[in-house]
């Protein structure tokens, strides 16, 4: 499972920053995707969540990841409790060179590349929403 492997790869980052990752998988289907590209998407999302939690000094940090199937698609939901993205800029976060990071550690390319990988290389869709706790990314990928 690529999500589990990616989260294992990032376990040091999560441990270092006291982030609990909850993962619920309701799918056993396989996808025809570029594995390394999808792994990069999950790394981008996890790193952004971690950075936001640190910058906003969030306590009891968590990332919830769930997968499920619906209508011949695999859905991956990636949610954090980092307080969300300001309404003024949420529509711009997939734009190239756009970054919300105040410390200038962001290039503004991570989410742009993630959207390109999901939508142009994998035939899927990625959307972002604010929740009561933070931000939720929903990725939809076609099942083979």
Cite the ranges covered by each PLM segment.
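Core catalytic ATP-binding domain of two-component histidine kinases
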Residues: 1-144
């Amino acid at each position: 499972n690529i999500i589990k492997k990616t989260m294992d790869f990032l376990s040091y980052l999560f441990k270092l920053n006291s982030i609990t990752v909850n993962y619920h998988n309701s799918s056993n289907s396989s996808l025809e995707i570029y594995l390394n590209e999808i792994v990069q998407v999950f790394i981008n999302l996890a790193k952004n969540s971690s950075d936001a939690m640190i910058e906003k000094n969030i306590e009891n940090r968590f990332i919830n990841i769930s997968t499920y199937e619906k209508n011949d698609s695999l859905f991956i939901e990636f949610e954090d409790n980092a307080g969300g993205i300001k309404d003024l800029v949420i529509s711009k976060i997939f734009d190239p060179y756009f970054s919300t990071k105040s410390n200038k550690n962001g290039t503004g390319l991570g989410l742009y590349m993630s959207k390109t990988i999901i939508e142009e290389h994998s035939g899927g869709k990625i959307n972002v929403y604010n929740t009561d706790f933070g931000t939720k990314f929903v990725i939809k990928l076609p099942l083979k």
